Amino acid sequence: MKKVLYIAASALLFTSCESFLDTESYTKKTTGNYPVTEKDAIQMVTGVYATLNKSIANCQNTYFYLSELAADDRFGGGGENDKDMQVMDHLLYTNINRFQSFWTDRYSGINRANMAIANLDKVANETMRNQMMGETLTLRAFFYNELVEMFGSVPLITTVPQNVAEAQVYPAQSSIDEIYASIAADLKKAIEIMPAKNWKETVSGSGHLTKWTAEALLGRVFLFYTGFYGKESLPLMGEDGTISGSIGKEEVAAALKDCIDNSGHGLVSDYRSLWPYTNTVSKKDYPYVKNAPDWVKDGENPEQVFAIKCSHLASWSTTIGYSNQYMLHFAIRSHGGADQYKKLFPFGQGWGAGPVSPKLWKEWQAAEPNDPRREASILDGSKTEGYIYGADKQMEETGLWQKKIIATTAAKEYDSNGGIKTLFNSFTTSKDYYGDGEKEDFQLSHEIDLNVIRFADVLLMHSEITKTADGMNRVRARAGLPAVTYSETALRNERRWELAFEGTRWADIRRWGIAEQALSNQLGSDIWNRGVATVMKNQGAGYAARYAATKGFMPIPQTEIDLSNGVLKQNAGWDASAVFVSWNE
């Protein structure tokens, strides 16, 4: 194989198109002399990271989006024609190829990771080599973890094809144990070789993954595998490509403890300052947070153990995914023009996906009435003057919206009375924030990183694995809540409250074995469809039946099954009976 870009041959397997992510310098270097310098290594590994942002360009097809809308604490929402949002909540489909872009993007990342892993041994600097190798192994583990949680059995590819003929042979689906064994091996090696530096002293630059990321991800993988599949330990792949060992809870607990004690990560003092609505520009006009510390900016946040970096580089012609498109999708649907958004300040315009279930609010209030995180996490639009139900034909509306990942506005002009006259669609376009050079586009101007794993999650995972209350009570103490004795109920509630709307709930209810019950609990909730009051009802076969039929796994794109000539097998529960036609009123 002569050129690094020859990895495109393997991408034939997954109908990938990566040209805009590849650079001229890639095509001019061969695997015989590349990478050599630290700059080369960073460039190669940056190509792996780039696929994270590529998937955000079609965020509605990602595992994170599914994890939010399929779980019990949010509905699908969107407008009456946004069926792809509503089907996620009801575990139905409109297009059997819905997740093609996500499948392609994740395998694109895996292919790039495989190429990097095969060539990073050429980097002379041992510290940099180990860091880059550890980052790449962790990224590959993350890609496979999302795929296996979303689709179940998928092809496991960990080497680079040596010729086009080899690349064109579609690999069969691997067993669940083989996939998890490979994930475990990648994370174990990453933890062993990556420098144990304070998160602020990253070897390769801000936003890169660390030893601590690998330890945290190992905890997440272990909890899902052992919980969902009823196992005691995580299988471990040997050097010969066969399962030859395992990782038990003691080793995982030790890894999480290492992250807690030695990473330098910690909790910020005020939960509100984790979220962009406490930024210095918006904060001065938002009474709820006037006494809160300023937003802890991306790259400076001690709770960010793993975050996908976004930036102002997003553009329609090239890199849409550098914009955090979740903030657009999860924002409040067109609401009667700028005057109405002033009343909803500082929360801006978007597509109305993921209205919050009223049962989350009620159950949270009943279980923890003095928890300030509830108001810090949820906007009650019904208490806002002039709130419009049914704006732009919003479906499955509850009047409740999450406040963590949402378009966030700022005042542009003030009237003679000091009130807001006009708004910036995003606070990041204010000259008081990023300067005069920023373009204003309500769909693209979302330059906030996507948190994947927060330090609070690490504390809660450690409590769950060790069945001790220390980590859980540290999280509660930050919220001003009293300590509690460890129990399964207390731990599950704490995860639900602390990590609400951060992409963890779907995996949690699946691995705890409560998904059918939790999903059915949505029935009877008060909602509005196009402004008309009704209640949440079963669609298709219904929540419980659909989960029982699918176990929460999504359909493999039919185009991939066809491309494989039947080597790939479709997941159960995704025949024509699961097609969503229209909302059952």
Question: What residue ranges belong to the model's regions?
Answer:
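Conserved, well-structured interaction surfaces
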Residues: 37-56, 79-151, 167-203, 422-450, ...
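Bacterial Sec-dependent N-terminal signal peptides
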Residues: 3-4, 9-39, 141, 183, ...
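A glycine-rich, coil/turn loop motif that links secondary-structure elements
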Residues: 128-134, 200-213, 274, 488
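An aromatic- and glycine-enriched ligand-binding surface/loop that stacks and positions planar moieties
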Residues: 18-82, 188-189, 208-215, 220-401
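Short coil/turn linking the two alpha-helices of tandem helical-hairpin repeats
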Residues: 148-149, 155, 198, 221-233, ...
